[in-house]
Amino acid sequence: MAEYFFDTSAFVKRYHPEAGTQQVLALFSNPKNRVVISRLSLVEMQSAFAVKVHTGEISQSTAAMLWIQLMADLSSGAFEVLPVTDGHYQVAGELIERYGFRHRLRTLDALQLAVGLDKHHQAGVDGFVLADQALAEVASAEKLPIVFVS
């Protein structure tokens, strides 16, 4: 079974059609794949839906329906949610210290990467799925296998 850790930049594409959506749907639809996200992604998804409402991409009622769908997917086991621990915060700080001056590594991206790295070191992941080029560069430098969706 292949396991994929999704950053929110890619995960959002499951719920809102945009560049890279077909790649994301293909990963989800393969029964041999296991999808994992961090708890942070749930909050980031709420924010992503709110931004899409604010910019007029979707209506507030559509955002509510997308959230209901996401919660239904969570309940059905379509993906696993990993906790964010104190250790992840520490690693995120170390990643920012190591890469923040040369790369555009933002706080929440560093935290996502810390969770993904932890999962990779514990059990291995077949791909860190993302749509953020700056984060992809840092993840690659950390030897995570990258699946870039765009």
Predicted regions and their residues:
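Alpha-helix capping/helix-boundary segments
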Residues: 11, 41, 88, 112, ...
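Helix-adjacent hinge/juxtasegments
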Residues: 51-86
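Aromatic- and histidine-enriched alpha-helix N-cap/loop-to-helix transition segments
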Residues: 37-43, 108-111
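Acidic, PIN/NYN-like endoribonuclease modules and their adjacent C-terminal/linker elements
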Residues: 1-3, 117-150
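Active-site neighborhoods of divalent-metal-dependent phosphate/nucleic-acid chemistry enzymes
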Residues: 78-131
